[in-house]
Amino acid sequence: MSYSYQFLEEVAVADLAFDAAGDSLQELFQGATNAVIDALANPATIGSTWMQVVDREEADPAALLFDWLSDLAYWKDAAGVVFSKADVTLRQEQSGLWKLQAVLYGEPVNPSTQELRADVKGVTKHLYRVSEQNGRWAARVVLDV
């Protein structure tokens, strides 16, 4: 598995921006997911007492990534949790639709035992892009914090 992400301090002043990349679309999704998880809290300080299964479908992989990363912000607020990890599976159906199946793991927010970082409120369309070049996928994402 080969994915990466890098936070970009010079891109967004009041928000948090990152670039993610992967050798496949699956790896791009995992890298971008890990970037959001890492932006919220140090995953090494988060347990796995909470779990949520998420299924999503979209024709456009860029729209699917945007919606999925938005789901992370939603579940953080709706369940009052931060995440230790997410197992993400992505595949293209015969119909052409992209299907994401993910399992989020985490636990309720507890500042006394967790290294909390940014309060991510959502994903913005500002500078958002997903592209593929020579078999390598890349995304730029700006998070509203």
Residues of each region from the PLM?
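Intrinsically disordered, low-complexity regions
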Residues: 1-145
